[in-house]
Amino acid sequence: MGEAIEPIVTQELAGLGFDLVELRRGGSRARPVLEIRIDRRDEEKVTIDDCARVSRALEARLEAAALVGEQYVLEVSSPGADRPLRHAADWRRFVGRRATVTSGLLAGGKQEVEIVAVTGEGGAEVALVRDPKGREVSVPLREVSQARLAFNWKR
């Protein structure tokens, strides 16, 4: 399963009204696993029926393009409570929420912060985050190596 999979998955999902949140490859050579996390473009919750519909469509498309072998596992799911923040649109959508962010610009390199605002566009987006001590820090999104929503048990 090469790098050619992601553009095909992204295109197929867009046609169905979904966005690709995360694509992971795992398993073994004999039985590869392709994990796909999706989100609805209308920002409604992803249902089991959504996952089944996407799975059927992706399976047909991936097999037709000969991008997967005969013995593979395709897992389609919602992004979950600790969804990754990969794009500026993700950051904007979750302003006011807490996220675990890895960046050399944060004390210790990794912190749970509150997303206060996101400014800029075209690859120059900057997130204003509030650290655990209440200090606000500007972090260019290109300087973030990983970010995930932090699960809040109180919600």
Curated annotation (Swiss-Prot):
Pfam families: DUF150_C, RimP_N. One of its GO terms (cellular component) is cytosol. InterPro entries: Ribosome_maturation_RimP, RimP_C, RimP_C_sf, RimP_N, RimP_N_sf. It is found in: Cytoplasm. GO terms for biological process: ribosomal small subunit assembly; translation. Its main location: cytoplasm. The keyword Manganese does not apply. It comes from the Bacteria. HAMAP family: RimP (MF_01077). Required for maturation of 30S ribosomal subunits. This is Ribosome maturation factor RimP. It comes from Gemmatimonas aurantiaca (strain DSM 14586 / JCM 11422 / NBRC 100505 / T-27).
